[in-house]
């Protein structure tokens, strides 16, 4: 039986068993279980607690759920203000992420990282999506089981499409715009523990700085078949940490972990 842990509208962690999440979460395909692993999606409504990374977590052994939450909290400190044209937007910074990684306890290691900019002119949105996925596959390496590839593809597709349904989400920041250019940042984090990762937890925070050379309304309703001109900066790293068993903690401790620093380091 597949289980999914999520927050309801009252900001409480809940568990859903079966092949899909509650209807209000179902419009995002990566939030649906894709394998026999437990896929945990965590989101809070309270502005004080809301993370600014869209967290996509696959954990085969629930004893390591808390570790995934801790890593997500740690890499929040690697979100930094963007360039001037992005206004008040913030994004995951790979250099800052390298600094944060050195402070995390128990110690882990950064095993891959990249800072790349991809551009395209008058080509389909799907072409840019495929190029971004190719870059991230290289960084994520052995962590890519079949279900993770499915979730990665869905997450990156929604980085460039379906933006009208996400425009007010915590992980999307809209920068300055003109009638000819729209700037936004998008932050995602994968935490993965499965048979391919072995005795470590893989954490992959990703930050995008995206320039689309058209107006915002067009950007909000882009589909994979539409044509668009892009400049996309990708900053990401893959952090590996030895597994930390949290089986002694109850499900209530998951909520506490998001609110109390005593669990973070």
From Swiss-Prot:
Record note on modification: Active after proteolytic processing.
What's one GO BP annotation on this UniProt entry?
Answer: sporulation resulting in formation of a cellular spore
Q: GO cellular-component terms in the record?
A: extracellular region
Pfam entry (one): Bac_thur_toxin
Q: Which GO terms describe its molecular function?
A: toxin activity
Matches recorded under SUPFAM superfamilies: CytB endotoxin-like
Q: Which UniProt keywords apply?
A: Sporulation, Toxin, Virulence
Question: Is Transcription a UniProt keyword of this protein?
Answer: no
Q: Which family does it belong to?
A: Belongs to the cyt1/cyt2 endotoxin family.
This chain's function reads: Kills the larvae of dipteran insects by making pores in the epithelial cell membrane of the insect midgut.
What protein name does the entry list? Type-1Ba cytolytic delta-endotoxin
**Species for this entry:** Bacillus thuringiensis subsp. neoleoensis
């Amino acid at each position: 039986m597949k289980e999914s842990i999520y927050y309801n509208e009252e900001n409480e962690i809940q568990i859903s068993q079966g092949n899909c999440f509650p209807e209000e979460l179902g419009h995002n395909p990566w939030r649906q279980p894709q394998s026999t692993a437990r896929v945990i999606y965590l989101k809070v409504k309270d502005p004080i607690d809301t993370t600014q990374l869209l967290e996509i977590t696959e954990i085969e052994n629930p004893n390591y759920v808390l570790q995934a939450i801790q890593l997500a909290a740690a890499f929040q400190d690697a979100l930094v203000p963007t360039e001037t044209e992005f206004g008040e937007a913030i994004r995951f910074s790979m250099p800052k992420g390298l600094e944060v990684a050195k402070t995390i306890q128990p110690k882990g290691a950064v095993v891959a990282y990249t800072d790349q900019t991809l551009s395209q002119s008058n080509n389909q949105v799907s072409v840019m999506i495929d190029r971004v996925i190719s870059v991230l596959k290289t960084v994520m390496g052995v962590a890519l089981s079949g279900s993770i590839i499915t979730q990665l593809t869905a997450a990156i597709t929604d980085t460039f499409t379906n933006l009208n349904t996400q425009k007010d989400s915590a992980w999307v920041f809209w920068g300055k715009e003109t009638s000819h250019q729209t700037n936004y940042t998008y932050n995602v984090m994968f935490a993965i523990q499965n048979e391919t990762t072995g005795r470590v937890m893989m954490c992959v925070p990703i930050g995008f700085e995206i320039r689309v050379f058209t107006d915002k309304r067009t950007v909000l309703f882009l589909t994979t078949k539409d044509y668009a001109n892009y400049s996309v900066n990708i900053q990401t790293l893959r952090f590996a940490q030895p597994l930390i068993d949290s089986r002694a903690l109850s499900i209530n401790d998951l909520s506490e972990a998001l609110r109390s620093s005593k669990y973070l380091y």
